[in-house]
Every structure is written in C-alpha cells, then in structure tokens.
C-alpha cells in the first residue's frame, strides 16, 4: 500500500490531499472519515462499512469494492472511473455533481440518484438470480 499526503498551507487555511494506491482493507467499519481532493487508485475493499464518510472531490480509479456498505456518505464532486462494485449497497448518500464512468455495479443495491448516474458513460449493471426448479419424480 502506498499512501502519500500532500499538504497545502495558504494563509489561515490548511488542506491535506492523499494519494492512496494499492490499499487492501477487509472486514472493517470506517466511520466519519473525510477525504477531500484525494485520489484512490487500484485498491481493494472487502466487507467494509463506510458510515458518515465524506469523499469530497475524490477520484476513485480502478478500485474494487466487494460486499461493502455505504451509508450516509457524501460523494459530492467525486469521479468514479473503471471501478467495480460487487454486492454493495448505498443508503442515503449524496451524489451532487458526481460522475461514474466505465464502472461495473454487480448485484448492488443503488439509491435512485446513483441508479440514474449509471445509465450512461459506459457503466454496466449486472444482476444474478438464483433459480430453483423442482423435478417431478
């Protein structure tokens, strides 16, 4: 995992930008985390719950989310590119001026706004179904 933090100081304002690359997290609950203007690249998150997190103007590229939950998260001005979400759910999230491009959403529960975002730009929605057939003897 590579995490690089860049700091900018301008008069009384301080901002911290992170580049997160090849991070692999599993079976965690992440609460009230804020990333602003950061990049998350080629990382994997399995069974992670993101609760009350702010991803403001974050670029997600080549990231895999497997069995993750996003609740009350803010994705304003973020860009989701070439990512894969599998068995994920999104509850009460904010998507103002967010883009999603060439991203796969497989067996995910999407809120209505994210569902509309995925209708163009090369995104893919995939759903699997279990079918049980009874065979007469």
Task: Label each PLM-derived region with a short phrase.
Residues 2-137:
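Tandem repeat scaffolds
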């Amino acid at each position: 995992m590579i995490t690089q933090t860049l700091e900018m100081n301008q008069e009384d304002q301080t901002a911290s930008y992170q580049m997160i690359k090849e991070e692999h997290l599993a079976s965690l609950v992440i609460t009230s985390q804020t990333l602003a203007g950061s990049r998350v690249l080629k990382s994997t998150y399995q069974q992670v719950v993101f609760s009350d997190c702010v991803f403001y103007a974050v670029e997600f590229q080549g990231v895999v989310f497997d069995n993750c939950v996003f609740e009350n998260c803010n994705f304003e001005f973020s860009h989701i590119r070439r990512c894969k979400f599998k068995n994920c759910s999104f509850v009460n999230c904010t998507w103002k001026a967010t883009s999603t491009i060439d991203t796969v959403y497989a067996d995910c529960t999407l809120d209505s706004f994210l569902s509309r975002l995925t209708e163009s730009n090369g995104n893919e929605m995939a759903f699997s179904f279990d079918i049980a057939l009874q065979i007469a003897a």
